[in-house]
């Protein structure tokens, strides 16, 4: 495991920290994270990618695709980023934490689970199977592919209404239908 020392200077009663942070995301959750990060006395510079129109006052906006890990890595090296905070799920599910842990070019710390842990959010089926395997209480379910519509409809007899249908994978909070 690689660690990086964060600069901390002490003068009489004050500490001055120098941490450069890259926040990945563009939604409301990331906006709230940027707001709180920008208030930290430990922050030197906050970089936000891709951000949204309301976040430009909180930090430096970066025209960066969070799914292009090599581009993120180049940005991290160029701007001497100490910490990456991943707000959106897609880069986590794609393995950004694993990528930077394996990187020989940078020793940046990533806040966010590794790819396998992110699958709990990234795949409803993975999460349900995990819960069953570890005896974690969860609602009954059945999983079907898009080519199994007849089987899915037929299985409704085994469940009691109301039914909740969820898309497997990331859906930006819009992958649920309830009847």
Label the model's feature ranges.
Residues 15-113:
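ATP-binding N-terminal substructure of ATP-dependent carboxylate-amine bond-forming enzymes
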Residues 139-143, 163-179:
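Glycine-rich phosphate-binding loop of ATP-grasp-fold ATP-dependent ligases
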């Amino acid at each position: 495991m690689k660690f990086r020392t964060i600069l901390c200077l002490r003068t009489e009663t004050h500490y001055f920290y120098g941490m450069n942070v890259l926040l990945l995301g563009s939604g409301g959750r990331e906006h709230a994270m940027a707001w709180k990060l920008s208030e930290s006395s430990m922050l030197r510079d906050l970089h936000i990618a891709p951000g949204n129109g309301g976040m430009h006052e909180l930090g430096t906006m970066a025209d960066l695709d969070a799914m292009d890990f090599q581009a993120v890595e180049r940005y991290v090296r160029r701007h001497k980023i100490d910490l990456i905070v991943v707000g959106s799920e897609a880069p986590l599910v794609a393995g950004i934490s694993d990528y930077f842990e394996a990187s020989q070019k940078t020793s940046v710390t990533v806040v966010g689970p590794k790819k396998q842990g992110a699958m709990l959010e990234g795949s409803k089926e993975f999460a349900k199977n995990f819960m069953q395997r570890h005896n974690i209480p969860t609602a009954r379910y059945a999983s079907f592919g898009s080519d199994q519509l007849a089987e899915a409809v037929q299985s409704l007899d085994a469940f009691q209404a109301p039914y909740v249908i969820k898309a497997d994978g990331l859906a930006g909070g819009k992958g649920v239908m309830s009847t």
